[in-house]
Amino acid sequence: MLSINPTLINRDKPYTKEELMEILRLAIIAELDAINLYEQMARYSEDENVRKILLDVAREEKAHVGEFMALLLNLDPEQVTELKGGFEEVKELTGIEAHINDNKKEESNVEYFEKLRSALLDGVNKGRSLLKHLPVTRIEGQSFRVDIIKFEDGVRVVKQEYKPIPLLKKKFYVGIRELNDGTYDVSIATKAGELLVKDEESLVIREILSTEGIKKMKLSSWDNPEEALNDLMNALQEASNASAGPFGLIINPKRYAKLLKIYEKSGKMLVEVLKEIFRGGIIVTLNIDENKVIIFANTPAVLDVVVGQDVTLQELGPEGDDVAFLVSEAIGIRIKNPEAIVVLE
């Protein structure tokens, strides 16, 4: 750098207006250099957390450029005039338009993140089946304690264990050009939310099925309502030995369709009869195998979903011709009384 930094000059008086403008120009240069440095380091970082922080700091530096530029334009009217002149030259040569006070464009740049975030959460909320019915506990930290509860000579905790909260992630990409001109399609964020929910529900079901101590019983074909009712009542009886309920069941749509038959003894469809029995909810999800049905006591004393981080959207920055976004959540399931869970298979 060839210019003299006015802060290095020995002095006994305040800066002049010209020196303040010099300081601001130097500050802008320093911030631009810092932006390049952080983005270059992020580009070659394989650690997602390091990359995330570097890009976040780079965005903060870009805000600092705007702050220093605003002060400089206030002090130096000539700079404003020359900037506008430069914008006009670019427009004549390339057709690209730029404006110092283009409020509409500024609002567009600010709004795209919120529009994508709103579409993402819409996909999550509409796609969820399990979390709409299961007890949810929000905690701080990256792990949770599971207290295994038994009902022998009084209610007591017989075992404690600690588990990490799994972090679920999905990335999606939006074209830089589309973000700039506002032609991007928010449905890509909605789809990312739906895929996150698929991972979320698969994790919950996988954890339930693999938990030590749950009961297992034979699942028949359910070709007639009597078979289905018999299976479910036997499983309910087994689960009720360990909990007073209310009881719910988790079932695949194809298996659920077999409940949409008239149960002759009641004159109603079997599913309507079961809704009166399973007041903890009949949860239909594609994320459980057709040949498995889970009957469980739907109460926090038996199980709850642990949320360490709600669904979050982060802008990671440019990757080629796209801008990358990361969707994440930290979620797990805590099973405290496995004896109140029965799997038909």
UniProtKB/Swiss-Prot annotation:
Fusion of the shell and cargo protein of a type 1 encapsulin nanocompartment. The nanocompartment is probably involved in iron storage. Expression in E.coli generates spherical particles (PfSPs) about 30 nm in diameter. The purified N-terminus has ferroxidase activity. This is Ferritin-like-encapsulin shell fusion protein. It comes from the Archaea. The gene is enc. Gene3D superfamilies: 6.10.140.1960, 6.20.370.90, hypothetical protein PF0899 domain (3.30.2320.10). Residues 110-345 are annotated as: Encapsulin domain. The keyword Transport applies. Fe cation 1 binds at E31, E61, H64. It catalyses: 4 Fe(2+) + O2 + 4 H(+) = 4 Fe(3+) + 2 H2O. One of its GO terms (molecular function) is metal ion binding. Shows substantial structural similarity to gp5 of the HK97 viral capsid, and while the sequence homology is weak, it suggests this protein may have evolved from a viral capsid protein. It is found in: Encapsulin nanocompartment. 180 monomers assemble into 12 pentamers and 20 hexamers which further assemble into an icosahedral particle about 36.6 nm in diameter. The N-terminal domain (residues 1-99) crystallizes as 3 decamers. It comes from Pyrococcus furiosus (strain ATCC 43587 / DSM 3638 / JCM 8422 / Vc1). In the N-terminal section; belongs to the ferritin-like superfamily. In the C-terminal section; belongs to the encapsulin family. Family 1 subfamily. GO terms for biological process: intracellular iron ion homeostasis; iron ion transport. Residues 1-109 are annotated as: Ferritin-like domain. PANTHER family: PEPTIDASE U56 FAMILY, TYPE 1 ENCAPSULIN SHELL PROTEIN.
